[in-house]
Curated annotation (Swiss-Prot):
Keywords: Endoplasmic reticulum, Heme, Iron, Lipid metabolism, Membrane, Metal-binding, Microsome, Mitochondrion, Mitochondrion inner membrane, Monooxygenase, Oxidoreductase, Transmembrane, Transmembrane helix. InterPro entries: Cyt_P450 (IPR001128), Cyt_P450_CS (IPR017972), Cyt_P450_E_grp-I (IPR002401), Cyt_P450_E_grp-I_CYP2D-like (IPR008069), Cyt_P450_sf (IPR036396), Cytochrome_P450_fam2 (IPR050182). This is Cytochrome P450 2U1. GO terms for molecular function: arachidonate omega-hydroxylase activity; heme binding; iron ion binding; long-chain fatty acid omega-hydroxylase activity; oxidoreductase activity, acting on paired donors, with incorporation or reduction of molecular oxygen, reduced flavin or flavoprotein as one donor, and incorporation of one atom of oxygen; steroid hydroxylase activity. It comes from Bos taurus. Pfam families: p450. Its cofactor is heme.
Length: 543
């Protein structure tokens, strides 16, 4: 038996640092070149960490970063250690759950520690979060020319080539493309009564599909998603699709797969090491295949439109864009209008226009099922203003303040685009006393704005009356910004408002919605490109 006064060798289950100290000398021996290289790497990492810990003059405060990967280092940790890293620690009240959901909650919590404007690092990219309305407005409205660019990060650049509307860089080309796109969509009814019949027609198919379920519980997502996607199809392709159409189902599958894969945490590492995108396995390979499938699908549609184009009678957005391309070729050899740009704009319209509106409608159905008393008030307002037989119209909005207030309250609580789309500064500036360097990524936390107790009384309660005055008339609040603000405000805002009102009122006019017995829906939302409700079932009864 060994003397109790002598140190004992560690057991196999001892901590690895203890085992390392007792390792045989030969195990740790390095040749001079290897030792020098190891020391050089350690010195570089420590030096990098030390430099970043030095508070650059005026930069917003924030958590200390890791070497090389910044504050994104927790992704590299084993799952059991992630909860102890900075993103998983609850700051004060609220917080995010252990499954990693609730990025908007996390950033709101960190704002309570570091202030409404704080910073962190993803790799070498400086990210600044804006958690309150005043900082968001000052940045995106009062300093719009500086804060309206998009981040030049590898993953976005690879996927979009800097084209389209949503992720394109701010400048003359973007302004031309957005102006043309917006005016063309208006030509085909965006924000006008002329689009109303298409939305009401689409609801007939929604109603038909829902009635097939009788009094059995069903997931409303596929039906609502099909309807919203078809309205975009009407604007872009000049036609709607039957829900069983193989081409339509293929397109929705491509979009769904693209959104799902893009949310894989490993893909975010591409922004640190861009060559990872070309790895021949895992989500990297799958994303490249999805990109290829979507490209073939949309370019075939554009090709078909080009071959059948009637110059005297353009039928949809693609026709109008192709005509404009030809005009620009004659008048402007350096025009930014081409079929490649059209491809990315169509992708933007579908991804941005479908996902957001679909999830907003699903949140509406969920909240109505949870609050039958509010649902009953809406039924009463519909009966009083519209009746049981006439289809709703946008002209009814002014006479239906409670219904409109309810939609707004759902949008406030759900905030389906909680962090907007990231912005980037095009030059160095000062925001509320903080220095914001050129190229800084800006995250406007719209979710935090909509839950700010300094603005909203009992912000976590569902209370539509907060949008009504003493006479029951609608109040427009400047702090209500579900579509963002500034030069990058959502281009499809008018379409989304039309769809939400007409579809929601049509659903409420036709059905009463309840949750299955003992159902306990989760209201935290499922974070992705948008904040979607967790899958839920509902039961309808015809009114």
């Amino acid at each position: 038996m060994a003397s109790p006064g002598l140190p004992q060798p560690p057991t196999e289950d001892a901590a690895w640092p203890l085992r390392l100290l007792h390792a045989p000398p030969g195990l740790l021996r390095l040749d001079p070149t290897g030792g020098a290289l190891l020391l050089l790497v350690l010195a570089a990492l420590l030096g990098w960490s030390w430099l970043w810990r030095l508070p650059e003059r005026g930069i917003p405060p924030g958590p200390a970063p890791w070497p090389v990967v910044g504050n994104f280092g927790f992704v590299l940790l084993p799952r059991f250690l992630r909860r102890k890293s900075w993103p998983y620690r609850r700051a004060r009240n609220g917080g995010m759950n252990a499954s990693g959901q609730g990025v908007q909650l996390l950033l709101a919590d960190l704002g309570r520690v570091y202030g409404n404007i704080f910073s962190f690092l993803i790799g070498h990219y400086l990210v600044v979060v804006l958690n309150d309305f005043h900082s968001v407005r000052e940045a995106l409205v009062q300093q719009a020319e500086v804060f309206s660019d998009r981040p030049r990060v590898p993953l976005t650049s690879i996927m979009t080539k800097g084209k389209g509307i949503v992720f394109a860089h701010y400048g003359p080309v973007w302004r031309q493309q957005r102006k043309f796109s917006h005016s063309t969509l208006r030509h085909f009814g965006l924000g006008k009564l002329s689009l109303e019949p298409k939305i009401i027609e689409e609801f007939r198919y929604v109603k038909e599909e829902m009635q097939k379920h009788g009094d059995a519980p069903f997931n409303p997502f596929p039906i609502v998603n099909n309807a919203v996607s078809n309205i975009i199809c009407s604007l872009c392709f000049g036609r709607r699709f039957d829900y069983t159409n193989s081409e339509f189902k293929q397109m929705l599958n491509f979009m769904s797969r693209a959104l799902e894969v893009c949310l894989n945490t490993q893909l975010l590492l591409v922004n640190i090491c861009s060559w990872l995108y070309y790895l021949p396995f895992g989500p990297f390979k799958e994303l490249r295949q999805i990109e290829k499938d979507l490209t073939l699908f949309l370019k075939k549609i554009i090709k078909d439109h080009r071959e059948s184009l009637d110059v005297e009678n353009p039928q949809d957005f693609i026709d109008m864009y192709l005509l404009h391309v030809e005009e620009e070729k004659k008048n402007n050899s350096n025009s930014g209008f081409d079929e490649d740009y059209l491809f990315y704009i169509i992708g933007d319209l579908f991804i941005a226009g479908t996902d957001t509106t679909t999830n907003s409608l699903l949140w509406c159905l969920l909240y109505m099922s949870l609050h039958p008393n509010i649902q009953e008030k809406i039924h009463e307002e519909i009966a009083r203003v519209i009746g049981a037989d006439r289809a709703p119209s946008l002209t009814d909005k002014a006479q239906m303040p409670y219904t409109e207030a309810t939609i707004m309250e759902v949008q406030r609580l759900s905030t389906v685009v909680p962090l907007s789309i990231p912005h980037m500064t095009s030059e160095k500036t000062v925001l509320q006393g903080f220095t914001i360097p050129k190229g800084t990524i800006i995250l406007p936390n719209l979710w935090s704005v909509h839950r700010d107790p300094a603005i909203w009384e009992k912000p976590n309660d569902f209370y539509p009356d907060r949008f009504l005055d003493d006479q029951g008339q609608l109040i427009k609040k400047e702090t209500f910004i579900p579509f963002g603000i500034g030069k990058r405000v959502c281009m499809g805002e008018q379409l989304a408002k039309m769809e939400l009102f007409l579809m929601f009122v049509s659903l409420m006019q036709s059905f009463t919605f309840v949750l299955p017995k003992d159902s306990k829906p989760i209201l935290t939302g499922k974070y992705g490109l948008t904040l979607a409700p967790h899958p839920f079932n509902i039961i309808i009864s015809k009114r």
